[in-house]
Amino acid sequence: NLAKKFTKNSSVHFLFVGQGDEVELLLKEVSNNKLKNITYLPAVNQKTYFEMLNEFDIGMFSLHSGHKTHNFPGKLLGYMSYSKPILGCVNSGNDLADVVNSAKAGIVVNSNDELGLYKAAKILIDSKSIRNKMGKNGRDLLLSQFSVKSISKQIVSNL
């Protein structure tokens, strides 16, 4: 639904890569709605993925609203590593929204909040300075909380 809202903005294009749970649904939506602002690619090797990631303006993810557990998609580490601001939606109660939003590394909303997701996307699309700042904050978050060094310190401190 987000892509439909940006069909008239030629500077916005969605690229979906890999084999997620909803690939068939995505392809059906693209076909049924004749969406020209979405490209889907099957899984690519890691080298190609990182080359592509370097070209993206925003890293996006979506977790199904039916998830009952906490989930931290590995792609977020890639987004943070490449200083990409994060745009996402998560199931209600998922603390991932707090992690990203409190670090100002991006904007994560509830999966059922279509208007909130649109507004978040618009903020990131319309402001390169906000994208750059949030991307930097994401990189800082990665280094402070998710690097091997920081995790090693956490493990040692809990011994």
Give the positions of each predicted feature.
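A short, well-ordered alpha-helix in the C-terminal region of glycosyltransferases
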Residues: 116-119, 123, 130-144, 154
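Short alpha-helical
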Residues: 21-24, 47-48, 67, 94-95, ...
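Alpha-helix C-terminal capping/helix-to-coil transition sites in glycosyltransferase folds
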Residues: 54-55, 102
